[in-house]
Amino acid sequence: MTAREKLIVGLDVPTVQQAEDIVSKIGDEVLFYKIGYQLVFAGGLEFARDLVQSGKKVFLDMKLLDIDNTVASGVENIARMGMSMLTLHAYPKAMRAAVKAAEGSGLCLLGVTVLTSMDDSDLVEAGYASDARSLVLRRAEQAREAGMGGIVCSAEESTAVREILGPDLAVVTPGIRPAGADLGDQKRVMTPYDAIKAGSSHLVVARPIVRAEDPKAAARAILDDMLRASFPANQ
């Protein structure tokens, strides 16, 4: 897998026009894009289809969670759209229903473990008795047992998660920041280089690229950092 296949640019912008502008500026530098609630509710599903038709890959970040039948119905529809990845919260019954619904489609289902904007104190406030690391590892095991394609977690847990999931399942990591970058609302973060070294298979990067004066150059710098981690002899 090349660095271009591992980097996912998060199109966390309010309008399709802004998303189209970013994709145009980045050009062929990036292959993979993430689309979430904000853009979906502004007409982003049609835009996602357009990206797929143009040869790009789309990670639909919907974080689904509902009764089994509703999750399965949603996954079936999304699988027909040609998306490459889809998120749902890593609850066992929902994951099992989603896996069955996506069977044979090629859609990679990802279990969301603990948001990278949350730390142990946030989990306590939300009523969880577990710390972030323990909860991530438990949900990673449940995702593997359910037959999911991988999980979403902080790079801080990537090494331990990789031991649970093995070499083939996806470990998708948000909260990626180049050295010295503003952390924003993220709490459990890592640089692109360190995240790849830790065992992450895909990195999701939004603000450091989409808010850059030159998004293409910003993406190129992150890709270079990822390449250094993958091929250290070329440094």
UniProtKB/Swiss-Prot annotation:
Q: Which Pfam families match?
A: OMPdecase
Would I find Transcription regulation among this entry's keywords?
no
GO MF terms, alphabetically ordered: orotidine-5'-phosphate decarboxylase activity
Q: What class of enzyme is it?
A: lyase
Q: Where is the active site?
A: K63 (proton donor)
Q: Which InterPro entries match?
A: Aldolase_TIM, OMPdecase, OMPdecase_AS, OMPdecase_bac, OMPdeCOase_dom, RibuloseP-bd_barrel
Q: Which chain positions lie within coiled-coil regions?
A: none
Which reactions is this enzyme annotated as catalysing?
orotidine 5'-phosphate + H(+) = UMP + CO2
Family membership noted in the UniProt record: Belongs to the OMP decarboxylase family. Type 1 subfamily.
- Biological function: Catalyzes the decarboxylation of orotidine 5'-monophosphate (OMP) to uridine 5'-monophosphate (UMP).
Per its UniProt record, what HAMAP family does this chain match? OMPdecase_type1_B (MF_01200_B)
Please report the name of this protein according to its UniProt entry: Orotidine 5'-phosphate decarboxylase
Native species of this protein?
A: Agrobacterium fabrum (strain C58 / ATCC 33970)
**Its gene?**
pyrF
